Amino acid sequence: MESPRLRLLPLLGAALLLLLPLLGALAQEDAELQPRALDIYSAVEDASHEKELIEALQEVLKKLKSKRIPIYEKKYGQVPMCDAGEQCAVRKGARIGKLCDCPRGTSCNSFLLKCL
């Protein structure tokens, strides 16, 4: 003695479950087809911005070329000399990096990181 409404309820639920993915796919297609706002950036602004960046890069490259160290001044595998009382090392966590060599009679203090 089931009522006709109880028989229709499972059928309506199954139909709804079958239609939900189709509705979601349609909504997703509409979202994908919407054009993006690319007209915010005009071609003129991009060209002028690129020119500015290129000019700045060329200036930096010119400065780097002028600061080259002559080959006879390069000392591979050596660090420069520093004065007494000057910072001779850098601490990064548990590691200590050497910045320069201390002069004779002094050594790099591992606590103060200075030539003492």
Curated annotation (Swiss-Prot):
The modification Phosphotyrosine is found at Y41. It is found in: Secreted. The keyword Ribosomal protein does not apply. The modification Phosphoserine is found at S48. InterPro entries: CART, CART_C_sf. Keywords: Cleavage on pair of basic residues, Disulfide bond, Neuropeptide, Neurotransmitter, Obesity, Phosphoprotein, Secreted, Signal. GO terms for cellular component: extracellular space; secretory granule; synapse. Residues 1-27 form the signal peptide. GO terms for biological process: adult feeding behavior; cellular response to starvation; chemical synaptic transmission; circadian regulation of gene expression; G protein-coupled receptor signaling pathway; intracellular glucose homeostasis; negative regulation of appetite; negative regulation of bone resorption. It holds the Pfam family CART. Disulfide bonds join C82-C100, C88-C108, C102-C115. GO terms for molecular function: neuropeptide hormone activity. Gene3D superfamilies: CART, C-terminal domain (4.10.40.30). CDD domains: CART_CTD-like (cd22741). Satiety factor closely associated with the actions of leptin and neuropeptide y; this anorectic peptide inhibits both normal and starvation-induced feeding and completely blocks the feeding response induced by neuropeptide Y and regulated by leptin in the hypothalamus. Belongs to the CART family. This is Cocaine- and amphetamine-regulated transcript protein. It comes from Bos taurus.
